[in-house]
Amino acid sequence: MNIVDNEATTVEEGENNYTFGSAEYGYFDVNNNVIYKSGTTITVTENMEFTSINTLSIEATKGVGIRFADSSGLRFKATITTDNKTALNSDAITEGFLITTNDIYTENRFNGKVLTVENKPEDGKKWFNDEEGKYCGSVVNIVDYTRKFVAKAYVTINYVNADAETLESDVVGYKSISGVANYIIDNGFIGNYDEKAQALINKFAGK
């Protein structure tokens, strides 16, 4: 027996194949944590349960922040929205950022030197501040504080029976760590940070 979106489908004896419907981003196998592409046929060998993935989108936040923890740098943030949170929280869907400098992007888009930052769980937590679907990616150890960086976020559906499909956000950033630091100072936000962070902000701003 198959259960798709809480509706049971009986597969008759000797007819052990099942063809998925037309959900936009496939069907998540709840028991095995994998995703099947829509319209494909599987062999049913046991009771199986699937949930459809009808919506999936990704948006990168236009503003850029400063990363203070561990190695400091510029931090980008993105949000994934979907109607299937169980699939989103599985390893079958992966996400991250592509980051490069503004000058490289202007000349080669993301075909030149690109830093790929995968979103990896830390301490068992996949999402930034425990906000489901939100994650960050950073470029650290920046030498030239005035050099501008750009980024785009991506989310990939890793189908078990087909090529992976990747969605990408618009390009955001066009900011330097010096520019972000000076914005914090000029707008009176520096008082919101502790002494260690304030010292870094002043350093990046060239104060």
Where are the predicted features?
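Short, surface-exposed linear motifs at loops/turns and structural transition points
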Residues: T55-K207
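Secondary-structure capping and domain/repeat boundary segments
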Residues: M1-L56
